[in-house]
Amino acid sequence: MPYSADLDIRVTDSSLRDGSHAKRHQFTVEHVRSIVGALDAAGVPVIEVTHGDGLGGSSFNYGFSHTPEQELIKAAVETAERARIAFLMLPGLGVQSDIREAADNGASICRIATHCTEADISVQHFGLARELGLETVGFLMMSHSQPPEVLAKQARIMADAGCQCVYVVDSAGALILNAVSDRVSALVAELGDDAQVGFHGHENLGLGVANSVLAVEAGALQIDGSTRRFGAGAGNTPVEAFAAVTEKLGIRTGIDTLKIIDAAEDVVRPIMDGDCQLDRLSLMMGYAGVYSSFLKHADSHARRYGVSGAEILIEAGRRKLVGGQEDQLIEIALGLADRGPAGSAVAEKKSA
């Protein structure tokens, strides 16, 4: 069953939310207007805008925003002629008043994210969002860390709370092909007509587009990506590449492939501080199963304490750290510095 009469699937571009991690949360109103204008003209139906860690994320722990996110949401709403504006929030980091303010500023889609075993903390937030007339989307983050049957049960909690689409979220970019299909299929079977299923991928193992196509084949009706992979880690599924592939496969997204390719090169690329690429650290995140937004933090701590960023990430993966535990990366870096090269995480892994 297609997403709608006009679209087989709906694509959400996360460049102005997930890309905030790569930009170190330094987006300006001018950046938002430029990117939203280009994506809107290319036919992208939904554009997500907030701090990388969602509403209320501007903080010492996560990184301070250059411009208050509510101002960015306002600018996005004012600029978009067709696209709808979405926002992300993590319960406990963002609060209910943040949702109300985002709705007042014109955003119409509320995306609520929890760790994939903690869907219960989203219940009251979904209730509020539905009361406000917002469309609701749920994120089961770090979905690689749990088997399909566990994710399906967590998805049921979100759907029963009023969530209209539950996403398998590959926060670490660690899922490989059939692992995506199995998880999406499990959610589709559990939710039936009660809620749609979506997929959010990262490029940390170079599989963003392939995984997203497999998610669609397994029944996902909503897919996330970022233009020119503008996101955490190695970035998200590149919207321009996904648009080209889906066009060749006859999957209707409503996105003009040539226009989104131009937007990626002419508008988004100049705003990026550098390309989001598959390098040593981002590859290590997918390999070790580490939350993608840890990339900049691990790199900074590695430089500060004179240790290997890859070793920091391997240890973070061993500890199974999740979003919100960024402070432990400092502890890991200090431990590596104290132990020296002979006691490094890589050395221990090789000798095991």
Curated annotation (Swiss-Prot):
EC number from the UniProt entry: 4.1.3.39
Active site (catalytic residues): H21 (proton acceptor)
Record bears the keyword Nucleus: no
Boundaries of every Pyruvate carboxyltransferase domain copy: 9-261
One GO term of the biological process aspect: L-leucine biosynthetic process
Record keywords, A-Z: Aromatic hydrocarbons catabolism, Lyase, Manganese, Metal-binding
Pfam families found in the cross-reference section: DmpG_comm, HMGL-like
Reaction equations catalysed: (S)-4-hydroxy-2-oxopentanoate = acetaldehyde + pyruvate
Residue positions binding substrate: R17, D18, S171, H200, Y291
Record has Metal-binding as a keyword: yes
Listed InterPro entries: 2-IPM_HCS-like (IPR050073), 4OH_2_O-val_aldolase (IPR017629), Aldolase_TIM (IPR013785), DmpG_comm (IPR012425), DRE_TIM_HOA (IPR035685), PYR_CT (IPR000891)
Gene Ontology MF terms in the entry: 2-isopropylmalate synthase activity; 4-hydroxy-2-oxovalerate aldolase activity; manganese ion binding
Entry binding sites for Mn(2+): D18, H200, H202
Positions bearing the site annotation: Transition state stabilizer: R17
Protein family membership: Belongs to the 4-hydroxy-2-oxovalerate aldolase family.
PANTHER family (alphabetical): 2-ISOPROPYLMALATE SYNTHASE 1, CHLOROPLASTIC-RELATED, HOMOCITRATE SYNTHASE-RELATED
NCBIfam families: 4OH_2_O_val_ald, PRK08195.1
This protein's name: 4-hydroxy-2-oxovalerate aldolase 4
